[in-house]
Amino acid sequence: SVLADLNTLYDDNPMDIDANILIHFSTNAKGTIRSSQIATGEENNLRINVYGEKGALKWEQENPNYLYHLTDDAPMRVLKSGHSYNDELSLDGTKLPPGHPEGIFDSMGNIYKGVARAIRKESFQTAEFPSIEDGVRGMDFIEKTIESNSKGNIWVELNN
């Protein structure tokens, strides 16, 4: 289920440019999405943090070649793109040697590469690109988020 607080802030711009979303997953895990186009001084600072019982992963779009792994029993590990300790899918999506930044266009190309493999009936991993079901779930999430906000920031159940 989701609970959303979406803000347009400007009468002449109907797009939601500031959002706070709470999520309850079917596994009893909880999540938070904070999105803002009005955060003073920020550029395109997309950050993804995932916290679990045994550790956490942190990734920042402005430093895309670094994945931070945190646990209670060890110092923070920094995993870098292009190194042999990464899995096959990660290495397949890396075109440059370690230390060379990959761009946003490369990430889009990786999605298209996976789609092309599927069309040609070549071997591919399901994580290479979103499925139709992923798209339907994404649209349901957007619709339920808007519904939650329009009904006064109430909890709304997702379809799947």
Which positions does each model-derived feature cover?
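Residue-level detector of conserved, well-ordered beta-strand and adjacent loop positions
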Residues: 34, 51, 159
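Short secondary-structure junction motifs
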Residues: 45, 127, 151-153
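C-terminal glycine/acidic-rich active-site capping loop/insertion
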Residues: 3-6, 20, 24-25, 48, ...
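C-terminal capping/lid region of NAD(P)-dependent oxidoreductase domains
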Residues: 147-160
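C-terminal hydrophobic helical "lid"/dimerization subdomain
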Residues: 135-149
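Rossmann-like dinucleotide-binding domain that binds NAD(P)(H)
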Residues: 1-45, 133
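A short, charged, Gly/Pro-tolerant segment at domain boundaries
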Residues: 134-137, 158-160
